[in-house]
């Protein structure tokens, strides 16, 4: 599952919330954007994609909710390799809830809003609420070491996450 469509490539190459990025999109001033967008759905697909990227010298940029607070979605100007945006939003499941130990296992692509709603139905909370919570993903929170409005009660994301499975080159 991938796309080479211009609109998908453009969407995955900038964030949603800064006036600078909105301006650049509206006035066709983005410096560079992804060559392809891959939509991953599992850890196995992620491993295969990273292996292929290494083999063929491709630059991968992860994409979650697209909030881009850290400005990490735009390919670097000096990047000469093929750039692939890796969309994690299809990895958005709640895999398990351990009510006794107050633990939840989720996919990297689940948004804060969806996770909070699912946990609230069981009488729980995520305990993490960055300003971008409605759109941002758990994978994005972890990769950017996000802080949230409830940090004084629950801690930042590094205090909340107990176990992490991560695929790296």
Residue ranges of model-derived segments:
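Noncatalytic alpha-helical scaffold of FAD-dependent oxidoreductases
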Residues: 1-169
């Amino acid at each position: 599952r991938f796309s080479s469509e211009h609109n998908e490539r453009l969407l995955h190459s900038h964030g949603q919330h800064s006036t600078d990025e909105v301006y650049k999109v509206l006035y066709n001033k983005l410096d560079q954007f992804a060559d392809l967008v891959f939509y991953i759905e599992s850890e196995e697909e992620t491993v295969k994609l990273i292996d292929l990227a290494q083999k063929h010298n491709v630059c991968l940029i992860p994409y979650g909710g697209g909030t881009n607070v850290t400005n990490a979605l735009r390919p670097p100007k000096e990047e000469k390799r093929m750039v692939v945006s890796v969309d994690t939003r299809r990895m958005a499941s709640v895999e398990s809830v351990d009510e006794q130990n107050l633990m939840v296992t989720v996919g990297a692509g689940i948004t804060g809003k969806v996770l909070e709603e699912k946990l609230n139905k069981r009488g729980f909370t995520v305990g993490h609420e960055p300003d971008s919570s409605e759109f941002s993903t758990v994978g994005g929170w972890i990769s950017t070491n996000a802080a949230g409005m409830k940090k004084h009660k629950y801690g930042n994301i590094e205090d909340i996450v107990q176990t992490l499975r991560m695929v790296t080159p």
